[in-house]
């Protein structure tokens, strides 16, 4: 089995890129799900001042923790408006695990995506080169044979003309000698033409095995690549699918701990540190009210985010690659070694003139062997 030839320098650069992206992905965090909702608090403060506090929250779930981006709009009865935006990170589990499982899965997803896309241009280039080389070599030999044939014909014509001139200038030869000379010249011409055809047969004999060997090498290397890529895509598909289920399950646990989606009520209070909350309240959310109850919880919605779409793209790419590779393996099994010479012309995709010349050459070859 023949392996694909890969330049060591290019392979080293590719491995460095993969390692760099893997390391970089550990510093990146892509949310899998996002939740948007609004909380409106009506609070009575001293001097009978009513404060309407609207909290616009966006929770981005990362599997083991989430990130709260909230925006406050406060409006008092004296038409005093305030707008405050804060970003708060809240860990529903142990803080030591929040940067491990999720970022490993993210790194695996990014690395697998690049590793699956990068070899595709290499296969296309190799396929084009391997298919074009034998065709060009064969056409060049046919063109060279045509040039040699034309040169031989010109030489023969010149020799015939010289012989005819010599025969015409020689008054001592009789008609019988002239006839003999003409017959000899014709025999010589026929012998020359036979030599040309023998050379054409040598072109076919030398060219077709070369093309056959190159096609066998290409098919062997392509088969090795296809089978290897099929195994890689299959394993990557299973790992990505498993990791997606794991992350989704962790997100659902986080949602159940914090909220009741059906009732749209948060079950667990979020206690932020005093550094983030200047008032130091352990409220359901950061707020400026003195109560822990939320009178209105509305516009709740949550759905997939960038990390989930990244996993989905990886799964779709794996599925598409597996289907295409299986199709190529099935169709490649039909590309057996040609038994008849004319089948090579279908693979070479020659022009009509080259096809006619090739058939004439193979016909002369069969006549010569018979």
From Swiss-Prot:
Give the membrane topology, semicolon-separated if more than one: Multi-pass membrane protein
One term under GO cellular component: membrane
According to the UniProt entry, which residue ranges have a biased composition of type Low complexity?
Answer: 147-194
Which InterPro entries does this UniProt record tie to the protein? Answer: Integrator_complex_assoc
Q: Which domain of life is it from?
A: Eukaryota
The UniProt transmembrane annotation reads: 11-31, 104-124, 227-247, 310-330
Entry keyword Transmembrane: yes
Query: Which cellular compartments is it found in?
Result: Membrane
Listed A to Z, the keywords are: Membrane, Transmembrane, Transmembrane helix
Q: Where is this region: Disordered?
A: 145-197
Put simply, this protein is called Putative uncharacterized transmembrane protein DDB_G0285049
Task: Supply the source organism for this entry.
Answer: Dictyostelium discoideum (Social amoeba)
């Amino acid at each position: 089995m023949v392996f694909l030839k890969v330049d060591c320098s290019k392979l080293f650069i590719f491995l460095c890129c993969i390692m760099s992206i893997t390391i970089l992905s550990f510093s990146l965090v892509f949310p899998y799900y996002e939740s948007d909702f609004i909380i409106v608090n009506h609070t009575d403060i001293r001097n009978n001042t009513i404060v309407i506090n609207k909290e616009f929250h966006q929770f981005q779930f990362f599997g083991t923790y989430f990130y709260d981006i909230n925006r406050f709009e406060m409006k008092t009865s004296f038409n005093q408006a305030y707008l405050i935006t804060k970003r708060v990170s809240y860990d529903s589990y142990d803080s030591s695990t929040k940067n491990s499982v999720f970022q490993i899965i993210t790194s695996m997803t990014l690395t697998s995506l690049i590793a699956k896309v990068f070899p595709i241009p290499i296969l296309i280039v190799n396929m084009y080169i391997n298919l074009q080389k034998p065709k060009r070599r064969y056409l060049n030999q046919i063109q060279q044979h045509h040039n040699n044939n034309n040169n031989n014909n010109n030489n023969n014509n010149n020799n015939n003309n010289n012989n005819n001139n010599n025969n015409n200038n020689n008054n001592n030869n009789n008609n019988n000698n002239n006839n003999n000379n003409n017959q000899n010249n014709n025999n010589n011409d026929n012998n020359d033409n036979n030599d040309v055809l023998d050379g054409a047969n040598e072109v076919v004999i030398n060219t077709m095995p070369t093309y056959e060997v190159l096609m066998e090498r290409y098919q062997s290397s392509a088969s090795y690549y296809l089978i290897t890529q099929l195994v890689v895509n299959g394993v990557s598909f299973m790992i990505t699918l498993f990791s997606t289920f794991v992350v989704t399950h962790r997100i659902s646990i986080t949602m159940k701990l914090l909220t009741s989606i059906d009732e749209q009520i948060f079950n667990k209070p979020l206690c932020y540190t005093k550094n983030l909350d200047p008032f130091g309240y352990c409220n359901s959310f950061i707020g400026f009210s003195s109560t822990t109850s939320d009178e209105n919880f509305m516009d709740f919605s949550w759905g997939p985010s960038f990390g989930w779409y990244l996993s989905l793209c990886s799964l779709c790419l794996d599925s598409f690659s597996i289907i295409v590779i299986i199709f190529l393996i099935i169709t490649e099994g039909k590309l057996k070694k040609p038994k008849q010479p004319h089948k090579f012309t279908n693979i070479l995709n020659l022009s009509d003139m080259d096809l006619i010349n090739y058939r004439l050459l193979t016909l002369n070859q069969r006549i010569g062997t018979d």
